[in-house]
């Protein structure tokens, strides 16, 4: 018997995956956020993701306002190694092995680091071509996450999904995410997620269908392959 959890069937997922994927990639290319859901038997959370290349202050404000406030920058290992960002802990015992590094702030151009403007400044400093360890300091108010090699074909997490989608869109393999939350502090799911997506005009994808799409095309998760796998 298959252990694959089916993609949820409700209006957010009513359109065929190929249609939603193309819309999602178009949105990412112009700096609009996309909803990415993981499996029901995993975190069962909806994250708002945006391509780091296209991040703007208004979208960052939306992530902070409508999400948990923990804004994460998802990057391949080679980028984090160039920035010399070590893991947050020596032994990762979190339930889903979420690979946080130490938190960061831009060395220049920020005040307290908390505002939407400051967090965008930090992310731009971290993903700039040729960025090095001296361009960011720790601790800070942006939380980098190390995406596993192979992307969602290796680990079915929002971290890997956001990096894979950015690469599929032809952008730098770097994503920014924040978990969506309701006003009462509960995670946004079901009807509340439907209402939010309709109000904001957002497209939704599920990690299981993204993984199936990449596997069907023989992609290995390498950014160069993903750029032509859409």
Swiss-Prot record:
Its EC number is 4.1.99.12. It catalyses: D-ribulose 5-phosphate = (2S)-2-hydroxy-3-oxobutyl phosphate + formate + H(+). The keyword Transmembrane helix does not apply. Mg(2+) 1 binds at residue 43. Catalyzes the conversion of D-ribulose 5-phosphate to formate and 3,4-dihydroxy-2-butanone 4-phosphate. Homodimer. This is 3,4-dihydroxy-2-butanone 4-phosphate synthase. It comes from Bordetella pertussis (strain Tohama I / ATCC BAA-589 / NCTC 13251).
